[in-house]
Amino acid sequence: FAKDAQKSVMEFLLINHPLDCPICDQGGECELQDVAVGFGQDVSQYVEAKRVVFDKNIGPLITTELTRCIHCTRCVRFGREIAGIRELGMTGRGENALISTFVDECVNSEMSGNAIDVCPVGALTAKPSRFAARAWEMIQHKTIAPHDCIGSNVYVHTLRGEIIRVVPRENEAINEVWLSDRDRFSYEGVDSEDRLTTPMIKRDGKWQVADWDSALQLVADKFKAAAELKAQQSAAEQAAAEADDAADEAPTEAEQAEAVETISAEMAALVSVNSTLEELYLAQKLLRGLGSGNIDSRLRQSDFSDQHIAPVMPWLGQNIEQLEKLDAALLVGSNVRKEQPIANLRLRKAAVNNHAQVSFLNPRLYDFNYPVANNIAVAQQDMVTELAAIAAAAFKLSGNSAPASISDAVSKATVGESHKAIAQQLNDAASATVILGNIAGMHAAFSSLRVLAEAIAKETASTFGYLTDGANAAGAWLAGAVPHRGPAGSKDDIITGQNVAELTAEKLAACLLLNVEPDTDVANAKALMATLND
């Protein structure tokens, strides 16, 4: 009886389903195909005309073949229950039922591509990879998404050495089975015409194609010459210092001016936090081996005043899956929905399932796809004052006094109802966290934000962490790609150097840029470009 019922249901599902399997991108990995083979009939009893539905253009990422739709509404439920954005819905009834966007708008959320994965048929497929390859032709490669600090697990599917598509790889501890559109579709940039495919050397003001040996030798010669000059200058400075000590005289103004005009022998390396751990480690080892500690990966940061007391590495302070178990959270300087979409899904689960009190302090109002307890938006220069007010409320709850480093800011803060509410929610929660986001890391008073946020976390017994810029900021610190520490946070016997802000005012003899576009990736890009062009 059960099998007969299943066969009958399959007949209904297949009544209007077209025989598109030979040309459908879902062919070979289609759930409807699998179920039809197991429970379907060899011959259909249906002889009437099949339903035809005109396809909708719902954006540049998803292709619709709505005649194939079996009205399971998985895509609708994903938007409503998981993503928190109702972009797709079903209109009409019976045979006239139709999956579509509301008011014929485009699907443009940060997680829209997951509708492709949950669709059991070929009604929703990836537009960039349409008709590019069959599922069984492609080779599957495990890798990690490189666009944020979450590190979503993915599969890259290739055909004859060409990337065809990227799909999520299940990992319950990180991205579960979901993937952001940025991680899913960014592979299209791999074959961009703007990318270099061969080394180039500028000769007489023009870029010329070169072979690898010539390019690498040129770079090695320039850094070697700078290192030799630096060694000579260091020896001369030491000899001059010894002579001054012997004569017990300070250098004259003329001697000081002459020293300033000396040809610069400073070397530097600016490395991207999207680089691999191996690249970052080798870059700092190369530069320090040449006698310079001027290496930095914190390219978007401008306040380095507290780097001497910073942790070994900036990290979340908890497991990613712990985010969905929170009862309260305060995110400072974070548009987490766009910057770390997978982390935002976890916070949404906490807000919807646990009724967690999630609060934000930002320089502008951002849209979030879950209930927000407190959403404070102030001018960027007022963020420290607002955070100090929350800290004041937290100290009042704990009964402790603020440490000397922040006592002045806390005592002058004007505490409002929203500040009290945030502190109370963190204090009352069984599981709470305070997190600094990308915007906080780029703030001109980042050190003040950090010390205040840490104080709030301590007084309310919350965890403290960072949602960092790029894919591998923590790895960059661990690898020693910062000027004040070596690998694994070591401080002993390490050649220290200048941070990126100081280097923008420095004359450089040689500079290594690793995965960096200096005119867009650096906080003070204008000053750096002037330094590099000097």
Question: What label would you give each PLM region?
Answer:
Residues 1-52:
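Signature of N-terminal electron-transfer/Fe-S-associated modules in redox systems
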Residues 14-18, 65-66, 72, 76-77, ...:
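Catalytic alpha/large subunits of respiratory electron-transfer oxidoreductases
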Residues 22-43, 59, 141-142, 164-177:
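Feature of Fe-S/electron-transfer and energy-metabolism proteins
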Residues 32-58, 144-158, 218, 227:
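Flexible inter-domain linker/hinge segments
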Residues 49-56, 86-99, 302-304:
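Short, conserved phosphate-binding/catalytic loop or strand-edge motifs used
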Residues 62-65, 90-95, 231:
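Conserved alpha/beta enzyme-core scaffolds, especially Rossmann-like or related mixed alpha/beta domains
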Residues 88, 124-125:
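Short hydrophobic beta-strand motif reused across regulatory alpha/beta modules
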